[in-house]
Amino acid sequence: MQTDVLVVGAGPAGSAAAAWAARAGLDVTLADAETFPRDKPCGDGLTPRAIAELDALGASQWITIRARNAGLRAAGFGQTLYLPWPGGSLPNYGSAAPRLQLDDAIRKVALEAGVTPVEG
């Protein structure tokens, strides 16, 4: 198999990198040891920066139906802190999505860009 770019790992970063490379006209193969969709027990939180990246990638349409949060709440040692998102050039909200859905949505964007998948 010949390819210009081999991306190993079809999580959010790998799938996004593969999509951007394919959109730049490169022949891209995206390899992952698992079969998709697959779940991971970590990383469900989406910061405003993550929301902005999903928007830029064209993968944010499914996130708009999810609950939004306006910041983080940290509790411990007898106190609770509320930390609002900074805003500025980023969206003023965050969200959360199960990795089962997030990873699959970004991977589908990569496949739509012409990426060749290799799974399992």
Where are the regions that the model predicts?
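Beta1/beta-strand and adjacent pyrophosphate-binding region of the FAD-binding site
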Residues: M1-A13
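Small-residue (primarily alanine) positions within well-ordered alpha-helices
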Residues: A10-A13, A17-A22, A110
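Glycine-rich FAD pyrophosphate-binding loop
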Residues: L6, A22-C42
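Short phosphate-binding/catalytic loops that engage adenosine nucleotides
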Residues: L26, A59, V115
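N-terminal FAD cofactor-binding segment of flavoenzymes
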Residues: D39-F77
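Conserved N-terminal helical subregion
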Residues: M1, A52, R68, A74-G120
